[in-house]
Regions:
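N-terminal, post-signal-peptide region of Sec/Tat-exported proteins
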Residues: 48-91
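Short structured motifs
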Residues: 28, 40-41, 80-85
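Sec/Tat signal peptide C-region and signal peptidase I cleavage site
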Residues: 23-27
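Acidic/histidine-rich, surface-exposed loop or edge segments in extracytoplasmic proteins
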Residues: 35-50
């Protein structure tokens, strides 16, 4: 009886494993980015409570000018920042979402000399570095999402 039960459990575990692995094969991969189309990245920032405005001020002072330089160079098409209109549960909370639309995927992933841009924009590097370090110290979490658009009208 015990041997039969073990065989039954083993068979059930094997069947469950096969189903799980088969289902993973059916999961649809995101579409590959079109090299000719704009590429969207979203950056989420969650600050420590009470530091939302301070983070926003430092972002606008020290990081947004770098992004504007990249817009002027044609690498980035647009930059937008959003904040939730209502509160969320703490675990899911984020304070700011920055959406950057790059010219294309290559522009998004080709490294640039951001340090050269920062040197040109911020001659007082000691202050700039201190403020940027503080901007990240007041963050509780930060994550990036590459977005893939799905054409709903295609079959």
């Amino acid at each position: 009886m015990e041997a039969a039960l073990r065989k039954l459990i083993s068979a059930a575990l094997l069947a469950a494993s096969v189903l799980v692995l088969s289902a993973a094969g059916f999961a649809q991969a995101p579409p590959a980015p079109d090299p000719e189309k704009p590429y969207v990245m979203e950056y989420y920032y969650k600050t420590h409570w009470g530091h939302q405005e301070e983070f926003l001020d430092l972002f606008k002072k020290n990081h947004y000018p770098v992004l504007q330089t990249e817009i002027a160079a044609g690498r980035i098409l647009s930059v937008r920042m959003d904040t939730p209109a209502y509160h969320m549960p703490e675990q899911e909370r984020w304070d700011y979402r920055v959406t950057i639309v790059f010219k294309n995927a290559q522009a998004a992933f080709t490294p640039i000399d951001e340090h050269a841009i920062q040197l040109k924009l911020f001659p007082d590097q000691a202050t700039f570095k201190r403020e940027e370090q503080h901007r990240f110290e007041i963050l509780e979490a930060h994550w990036d999402l590459a977005m893939s658009q799905i054409a709903l009208d295609k079959k």
